[in-house]
């Protein structure tokens, strides 16, 4: 078993080291992660300059390769020639903060998993809800359990799984739930400030609160102490509207 690890918080993030510890007993691990934090990078690729790859030589990250690019860059170059042996599984995370609802469209963590999926490799993204690493040991343990369950009882068809773990002690986690994506309200307004020259600058506002957190959603599961397991797909076609748009077709 060869597992490729990536993330969006950067190669020094505690969540990546925890994921490495969790999965190392399961097989050979290759880590290719961003040099810097790329939260919110989505599926962006670096096309205007070459990418450089470095290798950490000390600490918990010893042997990790890191790239001066995005999470998608990391998985893309790993799967298209940088590493010799094709991985059996791509795992991204453990992210600092949730990736639920529309978050998956912005998340670099989920994007790294999507890139693996696009290249035909089963892929799983892990996120721990809430900022901080208060119960990272619990998330580490759950990540290993989820991957072990995937290996022993894989779902039918291609796998792209988004996992959100509540920020709780392991003993307080209520269990696992298969979920759909919930929905958020619109993001908060931008925060306007001025730089020292009096020129306006803007910070992107906070994500909106949950709009659809009904039973069966990722929001609902996590709010009730469950691990949320959401299988994703990439076909964004609105099939319900397709018939209406066909009226616009030319002869």
UniProtKB/Swiss-Prot annotation:
Designated gene of the protein: surE
GO cellular component labels: cytoplasm
Single GO term (MF): nucleotide binding
Keyword terms, alphabetized: Cytoplasm, Hydrolase, Metal-binding, Nucleotide-binding
Cross-referenced Pfam families: SurE
Function: Nucleotidase that shows phosphatase activity on nucleoside 5'-monophosphates.
Record carries keyword Cytoplasm: yes
Designated name of the protein: 5'-nucleotidase SurE
E.C. designation(s): 3.1.3.5
């Amino acid at each position: 078993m060869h597992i490729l690890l990536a993330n969006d918080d950067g190669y020094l993030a505690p969540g990546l080291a925890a994921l490495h510890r969790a999965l190392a007993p399961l097989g050979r691990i290759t880590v290719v992660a961003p040099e810097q934090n790329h939260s919110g990078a989505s599926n962006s690729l670096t096309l205007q300059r070459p990418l450089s790859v470095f290798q950490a030589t000390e600490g918990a990250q010893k042997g990790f390769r890191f790239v001066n690019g995005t999470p998608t860059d990391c998985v893309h170059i790993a799967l298209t020639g940088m590493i010799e042996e094709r991985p059996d599984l791509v795992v991204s995370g453990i992210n600092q903060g949730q990736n639920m609802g529309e978050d998956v469209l912005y998340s670099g963590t989920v994007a790294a998993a999507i890139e693996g999926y696009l290249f035909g490799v089963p892929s799983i993204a892990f996120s721990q809800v809430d900022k901080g690493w208060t119960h990272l040991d619990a998330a580490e343990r759950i990540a290993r359990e989820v991957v072990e369950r995937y290996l022993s009882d894989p779902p039918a068809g291609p796998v792209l799984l988004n996992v959100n773990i509540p920020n709780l002690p392991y003993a307080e986690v209520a269990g696992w739930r298969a979920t759909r994506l919930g929905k958020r309200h619109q993001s908060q307004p931008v925060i306007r400030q001025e730089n020292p020259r009096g020129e306006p600058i803007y910070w992107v506002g906070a994500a909106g609160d949950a709009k659809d957190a009904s039973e069966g959603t990722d929001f609902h599961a996590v709010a009730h102490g469950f691990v949320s397991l959401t299988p994703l797909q990439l076909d964004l076609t609105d099939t319900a509207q397709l018939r209406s748009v066909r009226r616009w077709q030319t002869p």
